[in-house]
A protein has these predicted regions:
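N-terminal hydrophobic/helix-forming segments and targeting peptides
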Residues: 1-305
């Protein structure tokens, strides 16, 4: 499927968990520029009340779609020590980039046993976040880059906005390092325009049972188990659509769906997303066909659910 310039821009914006303000501003600008061309113009909720999250309410919602805007990365500790944010792959020599009060940073990841360091020649401010250096590669079959998780989930949610008439589209934060924004977002949604079902627009993994070019992944379970009745309904609808899909059953992993399940609200949820190879590395790889089926499934389900 065609990859637009805004996705490429998103991939270049750092947003390590807890530092999502820049990507949120870019996303908000994109929404304001595009919304007049969408089938329905949403009500937009953002600002300090929502930290760096953005909520779009279209019409009379029945379903909410959640896509997290943060990424994994690293944080500078003391001297030249690093600690991970989320679960990045620890590959010695990986190039890391960032910025502190002294200026731009480009360095390499040094791994010594369980200890992590950078090799930048000067001191870096404590608490500085470092991201994988970005290299976007696109051919006729694949997109490969750092942070496809979850820039592609955000991209799919934005594509959904073009045709959506009734529903919530919500851009969340903190997900890669344990979550935290979902409780106040769910509370606001249920107080403003209540829904009983949620879809998680995120990226999952290529495994022995999930493969490139075989369609979007519907997750029956990861570490957490959504309600079978709702998952069965999702599967039945997607079967009727004719859109390619595959089913995932895993013992590990999690998403914003966890916080839906642990919330005080009786909401069903399902994780639906394309699968990537080389997870949480600078070289994440996703099939363009699978991304296309992801976009199609969300547009279909938001009409049918």
């Amino acid at each position: 499927m065609p990859i637009n310039d805004f996705l490429k821009e998103l991939l270049l914006i750092p947003s390590v968990s807890g530092d999502e303000s820049e990507v949120a501003l870019s996303l908000l600008n994109c929404i304001n520029q595009r919304k007049s061309k969408w089938k329905a113009v949403p009500e937009i909720f953002h600002g300090d009340k929502f930290h760096d999250c953005i909520l779009l309410r279209f019409g009379t919602p029945r379903t909410a779609v959640f896509a997290h805007v943060d990424t994994i990365g690293f944080m500078v500790r003391y001297a030249n020590q690093l600690i991970p944010v989320g679960g990045p792959e620890l590959i010695p020599g990986t190039r890391l980039v960032g910025r502190d009060s002294y200026g731009e940073i480009s360095c390499n990841l040094v791994v010594e046993g369980e200890a992590l360091f950078h090799d930048f020649p000067r001191k870096i401010d404590r608490g500085t976040r470092l991201s994988f250096a970005q290299e976007i590669r696109i051919d006729s079959e694949f997109i490969q880059a750092a942070y496809l998780d979850n820039r592609l989930g955000v991209f799919s949610a934005l594509q959904l906005c073009e045709t959506l008439e009734d529903g919530w589209v919500v851009f969340t934060t903190y997900e890669e390092h344990g979550g935290g924004s979902m409780p106040f977002l769910l509370q606001f949604i249920q107080a403003t325009a209540q829904v009983k079902q949620a879809l998680i627009s995120d990226i999952t993994w290529i495994t022995d049972g999930v493969h490139h070019h075989e369609g979007v992944v519907i997750s029956i379970r990861d570490k957490f188990i959504p309600r079978k009745k709702f998952i069965d309904r999702i599967i039945q609808l997607v079967q009727q659509s004719g859109i390619p899909f595959q089913l995932e059953v895993e013992a590990y992993g999690g998403s914003d769906g966890r916080e839906v399940q642990f919330s005080p609200f009786a909401m069903d949820w399902c994780f639906i997303g394309a699968a990537e190879d080389q997870v949480h590395s600078p070289d994440e790889k996703v099939s363009l066909r699978d991304l296309e089926s992801m976009v199609q499934v969300y547009q279909y389900l938001l009409k049918e659910l």
